[in-house]
Amino acid sequence: MNKLNDLRLWWYFFLYTFCISAAIQFILLPYVFSYFHAGNGLLTSSLDSIGFHRIAVDLADKVRLQGWSVYQLRPGGQSPAGIASIFYFFIIPDPRIFIPITSALHASAALILFKFVDLLLKNKAKSILCVLPFLVFPSNLQWTAQWHRDGFTLLGVILILQAMLLLSQLARYKVDRWVFNNFVSVGSFLCGFFLLWLGRPYILKIVSPFVMLLFLLLFIIILIRFFKREMQWKSILLFFVSILSILFIVSKASVFCDYAGFIENVQASEDRKSTITLEDYKKITASIPEDKKSALLIEAHKKITADIPEDKKQTILLEAYKKIAEDVPKEKRWENLKWFPTFIDSNAYSLAQIRSGFRFSGGRSIIDSNIGFGNVVDLLIYLPRAAQIVFLAPFPNQWFDKGSFPANTLMRRISALEMVIIYFFLLFLIYAIWHWRKRIEIWVVSIFCTYIMLVYGLVICNVGSLYRMRYAYIMILVAFGVAGFIMFIERLKMRNMNS
């Protein structure tokens, strides 16, 4: 197993993902679980993928009729639809043609994660075991067996993390192939940033502060090593060129990317379904103040009063709504605190605004919708709760709730098994950090993943969205947790042998 080369391992990862995705889209959905099938291998609950498909078909038809001048990479802000339309134009309008692409993206991400873990374990067989949860968890079928933006995002994040690890190694240790690794790190950043730009551009805005702080730390480490005469000036110069190149990319990304589209991109599909029409909503809520309207609450009371005569229904609905209006989340006016730097205050304000969008979005998996942020201190106070949610949600009392679609209900049951595994290995992540506490890689990975997850925990009140959005980060931590578990077992065996 230790003689297995990276290319062959990538092919194993690819073939596994390809076969599972093909089986789901060509066999299971059409013939076994047809009530989950929306046609063309798409899940009825995968509203994002269905939407991408429809937009792509329309755009491909427009290109045929009017030429490429009407083409858009992001029609309606959706890059997966723009990419799909090209394939639909030249090949066939069927999302199942993307199975090789989604499989390749997932296999590549799994291989790089394998390389991360193998830096510490130095054993390919054990490192493969660590990557298995990332590779095989059923929740990743939302983007491996469906056409979605998350495949691009996942690989983009892992490529950026790979670049940071390479530069951290160059700064901290004596590394072979110094020039090659410098170029690989810059190339990895470029590819990662491009994939994030395609998938979720706002992540670049979140990643940028961490990258800048890390490079400041590496700059200090390099200077210390230089004054100790542990590094030659040529190596330092090349290292600084790499860092400056990446910082240039980061600065440009920060200018052209912002938090716009955060809510639209991560809104959970299960929470977009509503049987009430816009006309019904307007009639029922005609006399309710605009800032107190809630389609989901009104819909609930509409169902309750289904047998009440029409002439009395609206009055009863309005009276019932008055009683629950006090529980509707209220927006908090933002307060600028002078003792915080402007860039911190402005970013905190952006996060508060994004959270507001989730608080009022409704949905069956909404959590803490009554909590909003009025200043930076509010965010800091909520941080422990955000950590609890982002690491541990969905909680056991949510595992057996009913989803908006049968497929979502099934996914909640599956998430219960996944969460048990995640809980177990996160415990050993603590041991892994302690065991490899002198290795810079474990710190870069752990802090980076925790940082991004905390940002998500602060703003995303929808557990369904959060579960999908955090996948890359929490599964990286789980992989290192599995590595910690392996080392813990080996240490116990050695202790028993010695005793």
Protein language model regions, located:
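Transmembrane-helix signature of polytopic, membrane-embedded enzymes
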Residues: 96, 113-136
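Start-transfer (signal-anchor) and selected internal transmembrane alpha helices
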Residues: 1-32, 240, 499
